[in-house]
Amino acid sequence: MFKNVIGLIVEYNPFHNGHLHHIQEIDRLFDDNIKIAVMSGDFVQRGEPSLINKFEKAKIALSQGIDIVIELPTFYSTQSAEIFAKGSVNVLDKLSCSHIVFGSESNNLDKLKRIATISMTKEFELSLREFLAEGLSYPTAFSKALFDEKLSSNDILALEYLKAIKGTNSKIEPYSIQREKTGYYDDEKDNFSSATYIRKILLGNEKKENKLNKIKNLVPEFSYKILEENFGVFSCLSNFYDLIKYNIIKNHSELKNIQDLEVGLDNRLYRHSLENFNFE
């Protein structure tokens, strides 16, 4: 019986040095642990296909110290941060995890807990709806409802994890780790970078050798090996543009029924699908 059953909520799209740091910090902080990763599969929270398939991602995770990989169902993995978090926390709770450990830009767990409590009140919900009714995007409306409190991408996810734990009366203990060096859209710093930056390189227009050289120091050796083996078969949204365009035009009247679709976005998608011949 392990003393600490640690839950991680991950996408590994792709697995990079920051992810390895996350695992190493868990081993440093929690002795006698088993690490269970709930991972999005072939489709990720951005609603995009994963760069490499879920089996390759799981293979990398297991090679780098994760003990068990559980796939997060696509219904949850492609949703908003709130539903993504609820589904993930529910899985970890059912697996009797003692802790959930996540990266955070602020690494201020007490502050995030206070914000989580506020954001679950009726007053906050009313304020949020009012800002959304003004046509603001969800992140902007959320920030304004919190009196212009600015949260970075991983802090927003951390907040949703805390809300999910509180909302389900889970006994899981949350723990935050300082996110190393870079933010979601940042470039390379001291061999740390965001997954977004790595995908940008790999899906860019440079030669294969140049791309691989640029990411070699940003990912662990085994992750690099898998990415090299899968080079040329990476998945990205633009690969599916013809199918997406066909469905938008064919099912234009039904687009408004998509969950969380902002008012008017259905018409914009339809108009641009008629006018454009490629994803860019």
Regions inferred by a protein language model and the residue ranges of each:
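A glycine-rich helix N-cap at a beta->alpha junction
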Residues: 59-73
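Contiguous, function-dense segments enriched for cysteine-driven chemistry
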Residues: 2, 69, 83
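N-terminal catalytic cores of NTP/NDP-binding nucleotidyl/phosphoryl-transfer enzymes
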Residues: 1-57
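Non-catalytic positions within long, well-ordered alpha-helices that form the structural scaffold/packing
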Residues: 28, 62, 92-93
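Short beta-strands and strand-loop turn motifs
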Residues: 8-9, 38-39, 70-72, 175-177
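Active-site cores that bind ATP or allylic diphosphates and position pyrophosphate for catalysis
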Residues: 72-280
